[in-house]
């Protein structure tokens, strides 16, 4: 269960096999990765009211590894690939709110 408070209202979401979650204070979003097999295979992004904005599988041949922040204090997703991608296993992915998609932003080194 993932839970937070927004405008004095408790938002409670059932996310099976939740691995990690982070709040993006800049864009007022909640990111959650779940279903570890062995690493997470599902990413969900919600607005602060609990509405699901994105449900995503990881890129092909990758897993969601962890959630962190970029220099702008926005949540970014690290994806880990089984095979090198341009010399790296781990890559940062950002959420594009306008296109409602993830895009690779650079190596996670």
Task: Please name every model-derived segment.
Residues 2-15, 41-59, 86-107:
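Surface-exposed loop/turn elements that mediate protein-protein interactions on large endomembrane-trafficking
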Residues 1-3, 24-37, 73-86:
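Short beta-strand elements that form the blades of beta-propeller/WD-repeat-like
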Residues 13-27, 58-72, 106-109:
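Repeated scaffold domains used in trafficking and secretory/extracellular systems
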Residues 59-94:
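A mid-sequence interfacial segment
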């Amino acid at each position: 269960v993932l839970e937070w408070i927004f405008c004095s209202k408790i938002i409670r979401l059932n996310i099976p096999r939740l691995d990690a979650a982070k709040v993006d204070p800049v864009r007022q979003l909640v990111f959650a990765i779940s279903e570890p097999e062995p690493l997470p295979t599902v990413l969900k992004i919600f607005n602060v009211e609990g509405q699901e904005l994105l449900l995503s599988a990881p890129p092909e041949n990758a897993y969601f590894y962890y959630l962190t922040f970029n220099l702008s204090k926005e949540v970014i997703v690290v994806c880990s690939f089984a095979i090198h991608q341009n010399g790296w296993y781990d890559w940062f992915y950002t959420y594009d709110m306008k296109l409602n998609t993830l895009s690779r932003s650079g190596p996670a080194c």
